[in-house]
A protein has these predicted regions:
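Radical SAM/AdoMet-radical enzyme domain recognition
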Residues: 48-70, 77-193
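Short, small/polar residue-rich loop motifs at catalytic or cofactor-binding pockets
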Residues: 242-247
Length: 361
């Protein structure tokens, strides 16, 4: 039985959320289970203390161990966030938030504590506010927080495909240059929409190519196996990505139950234990086996795919299990997103090759 070294723990602070976004992953949890069966709506301060006491006394932790505040909307349970951060001021924290509940009191607290990185999710900007500008104007304290601290970032979940370039430029000019672009995994993207996304994404790459800081954040090729295979150290390439669920991070629910990750929690699959009873590490044996034999497991169902052995994003075992009933059978919508992202990467790699060949002529 092997014991992992953990890089992070996710504290699932609450089931509650103020936004009710159409693409939210929590929908899968509540469609499968009665809320009353999922433990307290909010994590208590005592449970949070018990969780972190367990982590620091029982787990093997990496040097830069990070505590993530998760939900639901984490700021619904701000009192526990404040309690944990004040009790462990030496730790590194991160939080994802839709930003709507950030008020002056929270702004002042997070401004004083520079050991937390905050991701402001813009996924609901069209659904709730008509676009990025409307969201920024509606959430002034969150806007101020992100503008003042370059460690905070915006995660822009694209649903208006033809406006990607316009919206990205608005965020970069008016909010922050620390931006990640993503596509919702629980949204039905049409082929035409994904093609429009790919075209605008490539335009952004070319527009910001000489802006080293922004380009590093924006460019998917720099973080893909395909790019490393062409221009980097081939020894760094792993042909089948997956998140090593349960081997690097843990997800802990509102009553102290320990799960491999948030998607496995949604599926109620393979609960590892609790902070009160400990972890049964033998339940992770199959993940070690997958990690050591990636092609055997992660390549299953994929042999005929054009992206076989070069898929640009992680295979999400929990997402597959939730939607397909088999953790190795890729969810079709996720495959479609990977294919359009690969198209952008391949196009950029070809451009890079042509430039490098031109230099050597």
């Amino acid at each position: 039985m092997r014991i992992p070294v953990y890089k992070s723990v996710y504290l699932y602070l609450t089931h509650a959320c103020n936004a009710n976004c159409s693409f939210c992953y929590r929908r899968g949890l509540f469609e499968r289970n009665k809320v009353s069966s999922l433990g307290p709506v909010k994590m208590s301060k005592q449970t949070a203390d018990d969780i972190l006491d367990f982590c620091f006394s029982k787990l093997q932790l990496a040097p830069k161990f990070t505590i993530y505040f998760w939900g639901g909307e984490p700021t619904v349970n701000f009192e526990v966030i404040r309690h944990v951060m004040e009790r462990f001021p030496q730790m590194i924290f991160h939080m994802n938030t839709n930003g709507a509940l950030i008020d002056e009191r929270m702004y002042e607290f997070f401004s004083r504590h520079r050991n937390i990185g905050i991701t402001w999710s813009f996924g609901n900007c069209y659904e709730k506010y008509g676009g990025p500008q409307g969201k920024a104007e509606a959430e002034p304290w969150m806007l101020k927080l992100v503008r003042e601290n370059p460690n905070h970032n915006v995660n822009f979940m694209v649903v208006e495909y033809g406006k990607l370039k316009e919206d990205f430029d608005f965020i970069a000019r008016n909010i922050t240059r620390n931006i990640t672009i993503d596509l919702a995994t629980r949204h039905d993207h049409s082929r035409e929409d994904l093609e429009r996304f790919a075209a605008q994404y490539f335009e952004l790459l070319i527009e910001h190519e000489k802006d080293a800081e922004l380009f590093q954040t924006l460019n998917p090729a720099l973080h893909s196996n395909a790019y490393v295979r062409e221009f980097g150290l081939k020894a760094q390439v792993r042909e089948f990505h997956f998140c090593r669920t349960g081997l690097e991070r843990l997800f802990i629910d509102t009553e102290g139950g320990i799960w491999q990750c948030d998607n496995m929690y949604i599926c109620r699959h393979n609960r590892l234990g609790s902070v009160y009873d400990g972890i049964d590490y033998s339940k992770l044996d199959y993940v070690w086996e997958i990690d050591e034999n990636r092609e055997k497991y992660l390549g299953r169902f994929c042999e005929s795919c054009e992206l076989y052995k070069r898929c640009p994003r992680n295979k999400c075992l929990g997402l597959n299990l939730e939607h397909m009933g088999n953790m190795f059978d890729p969810e079709p919508g996720y495959c479609a997103m990977n294919k359009v992202l690969a198209k952008v990467i391949d196009k950029y790699i070809q451009l890079e090759k042509e430039k490098r060949e031109g230099v050597h002529v």
